[in-house]
A protein has these predicted regions:
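N-terminal glycine-/serine-/threonine-rich beta1-alpha1-beta2 phosphate-ribose binding loop
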Residues: 1-90
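Rossmann-like NAD(P)H-binding beta-loop-alpha module
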Residues: 68, 115-196, 203
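Rossmann-fold NAD(P)-binding glycine/threonine-rich loop
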Residues: 81-87, 91, 100-138
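A short hydrophobic/small-residue beta-strand
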Residues: 94-96
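Substrate-binding/catalytic subdomain of NAD(P)-dependent oxidoreductase enzymes
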Residues: 175-271, 276-278
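Low-complexity, glycine/alanine/valine/leucine- and proline-rich hydrophobic stretches
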Residues: 260-284, 298, 359-371, 379-381
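ATP-dependent carboxylate/acyl-activation modules
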Residues: 268-323, 330-336
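A conserved regulatory-domain signal marking ACT and ACT-like small-molecule sensing domains
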Residues: 309-405
Length: 405
């Protein structure tokens, strides 16, 4: 029997216990041994819940018990999660986590400790919930040089943008609806400002480069400035707007960005709607591939965590190699990235056509039915730096959204 401990009995922690119980026969068969929860660490007690007999309040109980071979960390946040996970690894216990904040900040360090002790630190659920993207990068796609990873990595914002697109609603309306339906946190800042997606693409960027990519270095925009009017233009152009997290290779370096983008209806991420997530991968041998599924939620996330537990049970005292060194990779400046830009401009198109073309060069003019005293343009491909220089001097820009090719 393999004894495990679960750190945190919130949404995901209780989901892990539920998955292990409901699917115990198939899980034990695939692990090659019986997996049993011995302890659950939480500050709270749960009277009336069968889990109460396994509740402990002191991490040392888990660390000092040689029977515990695998620890599941689903507490969230960087501390005390980092201290607890580090101590567990140093005590020779493998760890599986869904904690993106922990992995983005300390993933390389924790992987190094696991390597030294011939144990494992796995984190499939930290990026795409139930989407097996990390396992794919570490196994199925190891023969490829990954040229691009672009994903819809946040279910809350994708739900909101989908509602805005199909129902013509404004941002504040769909945020309230997301709250009411349980898709948004009480404080939605991490989701709507793009911070959640940023940490996830930082993890993926670190994995494809083999070096530490700091999430603080990734240019990040959220969806708070997206309006009903933006969606009207998108429909006119047979496009949609998604919050994309993207990492693209340029030689030995990477460009990384999190920002809303306009997608044409031929783009593989165009039809990913609601709370679903998807990751588009391009490899130099594979070509294009898509991974799609539930990016969050109790059971999809717990399922991914338990899959890591099974992997660790099959590899006790044998490290599963993950290339992610502590050496930091400097990202290429966003000013050097090349895109087309959709720009909304105030005023009459006929009156401003000449000055617009003089400033931006050859552009495509766009009108949205029902909108007056404004028009839109799509520029030719230019660098972000070139666009910013033009925009600084050009009066009447209402909003800009990058176009994803």
């Amino acid at each position: 029997m393999i004894s495990i401990a679960v750190l945190g009995y919130g949404t995901v922690g209780s989901g892990v216990v539920e998955v292990l119980e409901k699917n115990k026969d198939v899980i034990n068969q695939r692990a090659g041994d019986e997996i049993s929860v011995k302890y659950v660490l939480d500050l709270r007690d749960f009277p009336g819940d069968p889990i109460q007999e396994k509740i402990v309040h002191d991490i040392d109980v888990i660390i000092n018990d040689p029977e515990v071979q695998i620890v599941v960390e689903v507490m969230g946040g960087v501390e005390p999660a980092y201290t607890f996970v580090k101590r567990c690894l140093e005590a020779g216990k493998s760890v599986a986590t869904s904690n993106k904040a922990l992995v983005a900040k300390h993933g390389a360090t924790l992987l190094s400790i696991a390597r030294e002790r011939e144990i494992n630190f796995l984190f499939e659920a930290s990026v795409g919930g139930g989407i097996p993207i990390i396992r794919a990068l570490n196994s199925s796609l190891t023969a490829d040089r990954i040229e691009e990873i672009t994903g819809i990595l946040n279910g809350t914002t994708n739900y909101m943008l989908t509602k805005m697109f199909y129902e013509g609603a404004q941002y504040d309306e769909v945020l309230k609806e997301a709250h009411d339906n349980g898709f948004a946190e009480r404080n939605p800042e991490a989701d709507v400002e793009g911070y959640d997606a940023c940490r996830k693409i930082a993890i993926l960027s670190s994995l494809i480069s083999g070096h530490q990519v700091d999430f603080e270095d990734i240019y990040t925009e959220g969806i708070t400035q997206i309006t009903k009017e933006d969606m009207m233009y998108a429909k006119e152009m047979k496009m949609t707007i998604k919050l994309l997290a993207s990492s693209k290779r340029d030689g030995d370096h990477l460009h990384a960005i999190v920002a809303p983008a306009l997608l044409g209806n031929e783009h593989p991420l165009y039809s990913v709607n609601g709370v679903f997530n998807a990751v588009f991968v391009n490899g130099n041998m594979l070509g294009d591939a898509m991974f799609y599924g539930s990016g969050a939620g109790k059971l999809p996330t717990a399922s991914a965590v338990v899959a890591d537990v099974v992997d660790e049970a099959k590899h006790l005292h044998r490290n599963i190699m993950t290339m992610w060194k502590n050496e930091k990779l400097e990202l290429l400046p966003i000013e050097d990235t090349e895109k087309r830009f959709f720009v909304r401009i105030s005023g009459d198109e006929k009156m401003r056509r000449e000055e617009t073309e003089a400033a931006f060069g050859a552009v495509t003019f766009v009108r949205a039915e029902g909108l007056e005293n404004e028009f839109g343009i799509i520029t030719e491909v230019m660098t972000e730096g070139a666009y910013r220089k033009i925009a600084e001097k050009f009066e009447g820009i209402l909003h800009m959204i990058r176009v994803e090719e």
